[in-house]
């Protein structure tokens, strides 16, 4: 047996595979190729959290595109629920499998991810793929992107502008690039000039985009679907509300008209969601009536409308998204940990509601905890 190979760690990987002992007798130049292949095969069979822990063994393997793509493809086929808890100024992440066909009174177990430093922002703006976009307001606007699985995080550079407003996180599935759009403004009455940062570039710099739009204020939610950012906005000049669209690939703005004048009345109550790849918007009233709008034709600004009467069990919860099968998911705003924590799946077609118990938060006894629930989280082990 070749002692040099043993010193390089090959025996560490394969001592439990007797049928692979022949490997040690082949030339080193071929051995390296086989080692990479076997490691890729091994990574494809273990959870993403375990892959993240393996980085101390072989960082170069983790950075290979075929390894990260294989892990991401596997994770996308099995989306997860992500839970973010604010406990004593700490932001903690947990995750569980996302049930495809939940049944009433079933249960899930949420397991923790890595902890992040206390000084990171705790305001969650967006989760996209396997990354989470955090933002801190007050005087110093700090923007951080973190990976709950690997524990990596980066702080984005400061934006240089007269005025700095909201920032939005997006992903272009064609170029496979993550980008951040920062809304900045100049003096009143002049078109806004906004800035974009591309996450994948080696030197992260903000650059001004060449598609200014008139001053407006974001009036409610935001979401990124298939590389396009959507958010509701009020325009002072025209005294109207519209859906603002930003294509992250071409870095261009466009607009979608609302369905009727009353659609976004009381717009602070509206939330946007992904409905089977289409833009959806909903308004939830206290009497249990849920109004759903779905953008059927973006080019012609055509919306469909439906109304649901929800059961009382979800009246104190908020909508956190819609599953790929069309079920609306509700989650409480917060929880007091001695009490059980439930999420609810409402089937629009059958008008049935399924309650699922989420376990795993028992360590936070006697804590009143703000809790955010996100659907379709993808475990991504890629380095940032």
UniProtKB/Swiss-Prot annotation:
Organism: Arabidopsis thaliana
Domain F-box: 28-74
Protein name per UniProt: Putative F-box protein At1g53360
InterPro entries: F-box-assoc_dom_typ3 (IPR013187), F-box-assoc_interact_dom (IPR017451)
Classification of source organism: Eukaryota, Viridiplantae, Streptophyta, Embryophyta, Tracheophyta
Family matches, as Pfam families: FBA_3 (PF08268)
């Amino acid at each position: 047996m070749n002692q040099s190979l043993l010193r390089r760690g090959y025996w560490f990987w394969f001592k439990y595979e007797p049928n692979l002992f022949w490997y040690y007798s082949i030339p080193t130049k071929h051995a390296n190729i086989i080692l990479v292949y076997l490691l890729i095969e091994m990574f494809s069979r273990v959870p993403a959290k375990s892959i993240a822990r393996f980085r101390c063994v072989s960082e170069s393997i983790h950075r290979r595109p075929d390894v990260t793509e294989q892990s991401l493809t596997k994770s996308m086929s099995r989306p997860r629920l992500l839970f973010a808890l604010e406990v004593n100024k700490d932001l903690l992440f947990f995750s569980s499998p996302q049930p495809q066909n939940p049944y009433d009174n079933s249960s899930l177990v949420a397991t923790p991810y890595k902890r992040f430093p206390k000084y990171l922002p705790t305001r969650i703006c967006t989760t996209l793929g396997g990354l989470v976009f955090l933002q801190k307001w007050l005087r110093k606007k700090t923007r951080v992107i973190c990976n709950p699985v690997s524990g990596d995080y980066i702080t984005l550079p400061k934006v240089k502008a007269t005025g700095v407003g909201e920032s939005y996180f997006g992903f272009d599935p064609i170029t496979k690039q993550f980008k951040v759009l920062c809304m900045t403004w100049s003096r009143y009455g002049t078109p806004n000039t906004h800035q974009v940062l591309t996450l994948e570039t080696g030197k992260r710099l903000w650059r001004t985009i060449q598609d200014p739009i008139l001053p407006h204020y974001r009036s409610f939610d935001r979401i990124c679907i298939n590389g396009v950012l959507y958010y509701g906005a009020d325009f002072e000049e025209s005294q109207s509300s519209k859906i603002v669209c930003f294509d992250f690939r071409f870095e261009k703005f466009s607009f979608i008209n609302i369905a009727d004048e009353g659609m976004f009345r009381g717009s602070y109550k509206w939330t946007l969601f992904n409905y089977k790849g289409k833009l959806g918007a909903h308004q939830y009233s206290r009497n249990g009536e849920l109004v759903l709008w779905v953008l059927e034709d973006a080019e012609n600004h055509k919306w469909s409308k439906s109304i649901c009467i929800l059961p009382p069990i979800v009246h104190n919860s908020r909508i956190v998204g819609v599953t790929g099968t069309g079920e609306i998911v509700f989650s409480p705003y917060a929880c007091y940990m001695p009490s059980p924590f439930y999420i609810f799946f409402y089937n629009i077609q059958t008008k049935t509601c399924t309650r699922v118990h989420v376990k795993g938060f028992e360590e936070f006894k006697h804590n009143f905890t703000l809790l955010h629930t996100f659907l379709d989280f993808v475990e991504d082990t890629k380095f940032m």
